[in-house]
Amino acid sequence: CIRDSAHTWLDETVYKNNIPSNELEKWFKVEQERFSELVLRLFHTELEAVYEEFNRGQDNDGRLMNYELMDALFPTHPNGQQTTIGKSEHLKNPSMVAIHKYFNEYYVPNNYALVLVGDLDFDKTILLAQKYFGNFKPKALPKKSQIVEKPMDKIVKRVVKSPSAPRLQMAWRTDSYGTKEARMAELVAQILSTNNNDAGLLDLNLNQKQKVLRAMAYVLPFKQYGYLALSAVPKENQSLDEAKNLLLEQIDLVKKGEFPDWMLTAIINDMKKDRLKGWETADGLSSSLYNTYIRERSWEQELEDIQEYEKITKADIVKFANDFFKDNYAIIYKEKGDNDKLIRVENPGITPIELNREAQSPFLKSILNEKVEEIKPVFVDYQKEIKTDNINGVKLSFIQNKKNNLAQMNYIFPFGTDNNKELSVAFTLFNYLGTDKYSPEEMEKEFFKLGINHNIRVDKDRINITLSGLEEDLAKGAELFDHWLRNVKADENIYKTVVNTILESREVAKKDKKNIMAALTSYARYGKNSRFRDVVSKERLLSAKAEDFVSMAKNIVNAPYEVFFYGKDLEKFKKNLSPIIKKSNAKYDLPAAKIYAEPSTDGKVYFTNYDMVQVEMSKVGRGETVDLKDFGKSSVFNEYFGSGLSSIVFQEIREARSLAYSAYVNYSRSGEKGKHDYVINYIGTQANKLGQAVEAMNGLMANLPQIPAQFDNAKNSSLKQIASQRLTKQNIYFNYLATQKLGFNHDIRKDVYAEIQNLDLAKLTNFYNQKIKPISYNTAIIGKKENLDMAAISKMGEFVEVSLEEIFGY
């Protein structure tokens, strides 16, 4: 199994496996065994892991806001009265008898579906399903009376507090998925906030004009009921009520019908395109299939759903909005402050389990010994798959889309923020500007009318401009973008607002736990001279003029670039794009790329204080420079020792000793020739268990554990992952670009596969002893200082407390 996971949500529990097609019958055998009888192994250690998950949720203010929102919208229905993880009292006295009863009542064949998507022989697969699941006996399901909520007739206000920046969320209860009201709500949400372009009313009137830091609308439909939500992050010195009023003003525009007549057609076309794109992947198609089952709908109904949307008129939307949007919503204010509703579940203190990793049951032996026809890996011949051509002297790379009418083109520029860090500001500003022909709002509307998505990504060494949509519209989209780039107009007022937004966003980032941890880990890895800290200064932003950055964006039309096209008809693309794609004869002054050093990691412990229930620790150690000859060994090391449910770290730290909810060790390979690899060691746990968890991790890493059977499984899993992986579509081209950065022009998976085939535990141990064991680490820790065992932390190395200003660089 390449990937094994599961999730639980309001109406579903879904187990997900990604398996090679040649292992399908083995998978059926294992799943037959797993779902035929419940065996609660590792129960008390896994229970403590659930305590950890509950406590991690206390540090996630998005989750806390959602709990309050659901409770307010659904005061009697399980949607709002029963969270997925449960309440603290549910976790304190769990009953194994009740768990068995639940399994026996609900894990019955008339209450679940098998959803299989991929390289399948359908007739054989159906026979396998019958063979292994056909003898499961259906049972009458427990009867549940349908709970009907009373209509909401007032505004329900709730407050959540945490250290992060303020924001708000407001929502109206809707009817269930598949109903006319749910469809109406979906269309209104997209009129307010379009999925793929910034052409909705919130996008244009609030985000584009920067009246708030961020605003959006969305619909979340359930099997019974659902909701339409609007959210906003206010600007500095803007109250939550002011942001709320701005959101309500946009709803009033919908009520008045003040949105373009063409918008519904554009939204529905966008929905069709999203459906095509989603069904191109196994994950996307399988999700659609299992959601159809959960919602008790037929696949025919799902396919015909778009036709139901097409029947809805603008007049229908206006009437719906006036009937639907009343003072009957829930609103959650997320204020900055101490969480006064904090609930901590204390760990009971458990006895660690001794895992016998060498033991194999007769069933496991039979599965492992069963021979299957081997899947042969398919490696890409880039020169064969990527056709090269040119348009007016500009290099053109082409991969044919043989599936549908979706197309994509990319302008690739071989430089980025390492050459000029101000490029990121230039293109941030660019997105808010218009031309002599189109205002900023009109520009977004034109792209949306065409059904063309546009995106500009500025990386450290590359600028990638992407245009995507239906192939028949791509040339018009390229023409529009070319007009925008060549004719963009500087606007001093918009620039000042963009600067304020950038500076306010930086302050918001300094209040967010994830951003703080990312900044602290970067500081532990690189020190002060890092890309993370090297941002355009506040002084430069305030003293510069709009034209300084606009000219920078416009000037890239004179820079060297190449084009990638993914679609059906190359010759038609060349003909249509010939007037647009041209090689400039003008000189383009490109500054040399700045070099960011990768200093040695020498044993320091960097700490930043943050008010949270748990503590997070990330140790980063600089290894040797990247070497293709080690790719196979590092892959197997991660699989065997450090990452995933079958790794030694997960089994020992979480399953056997329950010292952390999340723990892993990852050998992170550099993607660039001449740069260093890093080893990352992460633990997320309760503050009082950090010392024990670190001690256990250090014990595991002192010497690579020698477990031959587990090594064989990890090796075989790594081989099967490569053998069953298929690089397709646009991925071939971008994988090729990544391979070139390492200094190669061939599919390096071939080298990795051959290396793993010849790998044994002795060779992996030698790699560990030479490349990993000698590494010294810097440590990043975030948590509430008063909760930490400073004596345990002081043993990790030289302790340095760093401020937010030090780690962020502003």
Explain the meaning of each model-derived region.
Residues 3-33, 64-89, 111-117, 166-176, ...:
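M16 family metallopeptidases and their MPP-like homologs
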Residues 33-40, 133-140, 248-259, 483-490, ...:
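A common structural junction motif
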Residues 40-42, 94, 312, 487-496, ...:
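Peptidyl-prolyl cis-trans isomerase
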Residues 123-159, 199, 204, 276, ...:
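Proteolytic maturation boundary segments
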